[in-house]
Amino acid sequence: MTFSIMRFNPETDKKPYMQDFELDVSAIQGKMLLNALEALREKHPDIGLRRSCAEGVCGSDGMNINGKNALACVTQLKDLPDRVVVRPLPGFPIIRDLIVDMEQFYAQYKKVKPYLLNDQEAPQKERLQSPEERAKLDGLYECILCACCSSSCPSYWWNPDKFIGPAGLLWSYRFIADSRDSKEKERLDAMKDPYSVFRCRTIMDCATVCPKNLNPAKAIRKIRTEMLQETESGE
């Protein structure tokens, strides 16, 4: 197989360029794209990429594979053509090769306060939920912050410092929907500006690329609905 990888070293290169590598994938251990990239790195150790668990859990090896954002560790080689084009996640500054600067992404994640807020007196044990209340979190808590969704979103490309983005808004709704959280109104009020939520144009790329098959656009729609209901009720 041929792997065309975007290369960029800011210390030596004026701009990114593509470099082709040939690899006999039948001779490597593993059946995933990440295994092939690791095999290439053994021969070319200057290729820069992020990886950690290699099990689709940590979200660290997100990249653009033949034009679609995905995790290299769960992308099977048998599903790819003989020529594979690999680029870094779009919309982020490139640190080196396939490694991008995700500082802005995490700043938007931090903005939504991704943790339980509850000003009620803490119980002696855990805060209980009914099975029905717990079920409302399905499709929300599974996000691994790989940034495949946000980096596929044109609205996020245009306003990365103002639009929270699909991943951040998915996490926001995960706590808005949590019965153990008592700050729903404060969370909604913090996003009632023209950009935080309402820059979503329902392009749906976020749901298309999510490796966990989550739907950030659905969560964004629910946030908007709750905002409108709150406005109509005069709260």
Swiss-Prot record:
<dbReference type="InterPro" id="IPR017896">
    <property type="entry name" value="4Fe4S_Fe-S-bd"/>
</dbReference>
<dbReference type="InterPro" id="IPR050573">
    <property type="entry name" value="SDH/FRD_Iron-Sulfur"/>
</dbReference>
<dbReference type="GO" id="GO:0022904">
    <property type="term" value="P:respiratory electron transport chain"/>
</dbReference>
<dbReference type="InterPro" id="IPR012675">
    <property type="entry name" value="Beta-grasp_dom_sf"/>
</dbReference>
<dbReference type="Pfam" id="PF13085">
    <property type="entry name" value="Fer2_3"/>
</dbReference>
<dbReference type="GO" id="GO:0008177">
    <property type="term" value="F:succinate dehydrogenase (quinone) activity"/>
</dbReference>
<dbReference type="GO" id="GO:0006099">
    <property type="term" value="P:tricarboxylic acid cycle"/>
</dbReference>
<dbReference type="InterPro" id="IPR036010">
    <property type="entry name" value="2Fe-2S_ferredoxin-like_sf"/>
</dbReference>
<dbReference type="GO" id="GO:0051539">
    <property type="term" value="F:4 iron, 4 sulfur cluster binding"/>
</dbReference>
<dbReference type="GO" id="GO:0009055">
    <property type="term" value="F:electron transfer activity"/>
</dbReference>
<keyword id="KW-0816">Tricarboxylic acid cycle</keyword>
<dbReference type="InterPro" id="IPR017900">
    <property type="entry name" value="4Fe4S_Fe_S_CS"/>
</dbReference>
<keyword id="KW-0408">Iron</keyword>
<feature type="binding site">
    <location>
        <position position="58"/>
    </location>
    <ligand>
        <name>[2Fe-2S] cluster</name>
    </ligand>
</feature>
<feature type="binding site">
    <location>
        <position position="206"/>
    </location>
    <ligand>
        <name>[3Fe-4S] cluster</name>
    </ligand>
</feature>
<keyword id="KW-0003">3Fe-4S</keyword>
<dbReference type="InterPro" id="IPR009051">
    <property type="entry name" value="Helical_ferredxn"/>
</dbReference>
<feature type="binding site">
    <location>
        <position position="53"/>
    </location>
    <ligand>
        <name>[2Fe-2S] cluster</name>
    </ligand>
</feature>
<dbReference type="Pfam" id="PF13534">
    <property type="entry name" value="Fer4_17"/>
</dbReference>
<feature type="binding site">
    <location>
        <position position="210"/>
    </location>
    <ligand>
        <name>[4Fe-4S] cluster</name>
    </ligand>
</feature>
<dbReference type="GO" id="GO:0009060">
    <property type="term" value="P:aerobic respiration"/>
</dbReference>
<keyword id="KW-0004">4Fe-4S</keyword>
<feature type="binding site">
    <location>
        <position position="146"/>
    </location>
    <ligand>
        <name>[4Fe-4S] cluster</name>
    </ligand>
</feature>
<dbReference type="InterPro" id="IPR025192">
    <property type="entry name" value="Succ_DH/fum_Rdtase_N"/>
</dbReference>
<keyword id="KW-0479">Metal-binding</keyword>
<feature type="binding site">
    <location>
        <position position="153"/>
    </location>
    <ligand>
        <name>[3Fe-4S] cluster</name>
    </ligand>
</feature>
<keyword id="KW-0411">Iron-sulfur</keyword>
<comment type="pathway">
    <text>Carbohydrate metabolism; tricarboxylic acid cycle; fumarate from succinate (bacterial route): step 1/1.</text>
</comment>
<keyword id="KW-0001">2Fe-2S</keyword>
<comment type="subunit">
    <text>Part of an enzyme complex containing four subunits: a flavoprotein, an iron-sulfur protein, cytochrome b-556 and a hydrophobic protein.</text>
</comment>
<dbReference type="GO" id="GO:0051537">
    <property type="term" value="F:2 iron, 2 sulfur cluster binding"/>
</dbReference>
<protein>
    <recommendedName>
        <fullName>Succinate dehydrogenase iron-sulfur subunit</fullName>
        <ecNumber>1.3.5.1</ecNumber>
    </recommendedName>
</protein>
<dbReference type="GO" id="GO:0051538">
    <property type="term" value="F:3 iron, 4 sulfur cluster binding"/>
</dbReference>
<feature type="binding site">
    <location>
        <position position="149"/>
    </location>
    <ligand>
        <name>[4Fe-4S] cluster</name>
    </ligand>
</feature>
<dbReference type="InterPro" id="IPR004489">
    <property type="entry name" value="Succ_DH/fum_Rdtase_Fe-S"/>
</dbReference>
<keyword id="KW-0249">Electron transport</keyword>
<dbReference type="GO" id="GO:0046872">
    <property type="term" value="F:metal ion binding"/>
</dbReference>
<feature type="binding site">
    <location>
        <position position="143"/>
    </location>
    <ligand>
        <name>[4Fe-4S] cluster</name>
    </ligand>
</feature>
<feature type="binding site">
    <location>
        <position position="73"/>
    </location>
    <ligand>
        <name>[2Fe-2S] cluster</name>
    </ligand>
</feature>
<comment type="similarity">
    <text>Belongs to the succinate dehydrogenase/fumarate reductase iron-sulfur protein family.</text>
</comment>
<keyword id="KW-0813">Transport</keyword>
<feature type="domain" description="4Fe-4S ferredoxin-type">
    <location>
        <begin position="133"/>
        <end position="163"/>
    </location>
</feature>
